[in-house]
Amino acid sequence: MATRDPYGLGLEAEVNRLSDYDPLWPRAFAEEADRIKTALGPVVIAIEHYGSTAVPGLRAKPIIDMLIGVAEIDQGLSMIESMAHLGYDYAGSQGIPEHHIFGRGAVRTHLAHVVVHGGAQWKSCLGFRDRLRADPVTRARYLALKEQLAAEAPTRAAYTAGKSEFVLANSG
C-alpha cells in the first residue's frame, strides 16, 4: 500500500494487516500528541501511547493508538470540532462504556481514545500495554493471536473482538 504518511502509517477500512515494529512509531505518537495537546489545551490531562505500536518489537497494525485522559468523560464530546480540524472523525464509543473514539484519515493512521484520566479504562489500557512490554511470554501469545486473527477475521471489528478476551485477561 502506498502511503503519504512519513512514518509508513495507515490502513484502509476493513483491512487487517500487521507490520513489523518500526522504531519511529514512538516519534509519530509524540508528534501527534503535541498537535492534539496544542489544539485541545487544558482539557487534556495526559496523552499516552498504547496499543501494539507502543510495544517495542511487536508486530502491529500500522495505526498509532493514543489514550487521551480527561477529567470528565463528557469532555470527549466537546472535542469533536477541534479534533475535526486536526483531521479526526468522531466514531462514538463503539460500545465501550466511558470511552470516546476519534479516527484520523480515510486511510487510518491514528486512533485517539478519550477516557477519564486515572479511571478504569485508563488503568486497563495502560495495564495491558505495560504487561506486553514487560512479559515476553504474554507478548508472544498475543502476537500469535493477532497473526491468526489478521489472516482469518473478515472485518476489523471481528479482529478486534477476537482479541478482547485476551486483552481483558491480561490488563491488570
Q: What is each residue range found by the language model?
A:
Residues 1-48:
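Helical scaffold of the NTase/Pol beta-like nucleotidyltransferase catalytic core
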Residues 8-13, 57-61, 106:
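Short, flexible turn/loop "capping" segments at secondary-structure junctions
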Residues 14-24, 68-69, 127-132:
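Short histidine-centered catalytic/ligand-binding loop motif
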Residues 35-77:
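Active-site nucleotide-donor binding segment shared across nucleotidyl transfer reactions
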Residues 78-87:
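Short amphipathic alpha-helices in soluble, non-transmembrane regions
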Residues 88-120:
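Conserved catalytic core of two-metal-ion nucleotidyltransferases
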Residues 120-172:
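Catalytic cores of NTP-dependent nucleotidyl/adenyl transfer enzymes across multiple folds
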